[in-house]
Design a protein with these regions (language model features):
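His/Met- and acidic-residue-enriched segments that coordinate or traffic transition-metal cofactors
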Residues: 2-199
Length: 199
């Protein structure tokens, strides 16, 4: 019976192994946290070129692109740090998960299958805002190009106002699914104004 009991040496060996396994698990948990945090920050950074703060709205398309970037980053970082991450099973799982996430993100961003009326417009508003920012601030010398930029600014501002009105109207009254309903709730006319001068 005494022979069956664990010896002090056995206990020491087992205890010495536990921290090592724990450290390995912590490394992979930190890796996942690093990728997740980076994805959140990348999504937020994509709004850095928004013309004004009110144009920052949820965009499913940008979220899908964040999935693509996160999946790509996970594979690249793992490849460069294989010396730190030595669990083949975990590494294969990360690689396969990243491929699956990349495929899902590609399908969603190209098919737009989950994007409806309101989510489409809320994604288009920050997209239009980029055009306003670049068209207002670009160092343009050619008068023809300047006039084109002004037209773009005015059109994008007008369309942003229209989309914001439509989002509010749909939230309050539901979609106008027929021409009769649409005609009874016409979109107001907005006039976009450019700050840029081409004189």
């Amino acid at each position: 019976m005494k022979d069956d009991l664990p010896t002090k040496d056995t206990n020491k060996t087992m205890n010495s192994l536990l921290p090592k396994r724990s450290d390995k698990q912590k490394k992979y948990l930190r890796f996942g946290a690093m990728i997740g945090t980076s994805m959140v920050l990348m999504y937020l950074v994509m709004y850095a070129n928004t013309y004004q703060l009110s144009h920052v709205q949820w965009s499913e398309t940008r979220f899908f692109m964040t999935l693509l970037m996160g999946a790509t980053m996970a594979v690249v970082m793992l490849a460069f740090m294989l010396g730190m991450y030595k669990n083949p099973t975990a590494n294969i799982a990360i690689a396969m998960g990243s491929v699956a996430l990349f495929a899902l993100g590609t399908f969603l961003v190209r098919s737009q299958t989950t994007v409806g009326d309101e989510s489409w417009m809320s994604g288009m508003i920050p997209h239009h805002s980029i055009a306003i920012l670049t068209s207002e601030n670009a160092e343009i010398e050619d008068v023809r190009v300047c006039n084109l930029a002004k037209n773009i600014i005015e059109a994008q501002k007008r369309e942003i106002d229209e989309m914001q009105w439509l989002i509010d109207d749909i939230n309050q009254n539901g979609p106008a699914a027929t021409s009769v309903k649409a005609n009874s709730r016409p979109v107001p006319e907005y006039a976009g104004e450019a700050m840029r001068s081409c004189d």
